[in-house]
Amino acid sequence: MLRSEKTGCYEVPGGGIEAGETPEAAMARETLEEAGLIVIPASVREYGCVHRVQKAPWDETERFIQDNYYYLCEAEAPAAPQTPDGYVAQEGCVLEFVDPSDAIRRNRGAGEGFSEPMVLEREARVLELLIAEGYFD
């Protein structure tokens, strides 16, 4: 997972889908950029999608709607330097192998100090599902 050096919170690599890009290709690109890991294409399996609807941070009268796709995959060991941009660069995110229960505890303990608490809760809930379904056994 990516750990923010500012907050100590955890997120999976992710980001926007570029024009003409599939969600799977976006996942592989973002994983390389943010974590320096090369996704093994034959290993990619769709896990699910979280549909996020909330007040828009830029205007309380508008809604922000986002679909967050999750994939299971294997990746080659860190093969490239991280080249994060935007939010991930600002947070000083670094790749860290972490026990999923520890990541859940840290994210839920972050409180309101984190700019996007719903993101942390989303990641915690996805990790809980993965644990319940035996993916970390």
Regions found by a protein language model. Name each.
Residues 51-82, 96:
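Active-site-adjacent beta-strand/loop module that shapes the phosphate/pyrophosphate-binding cleft
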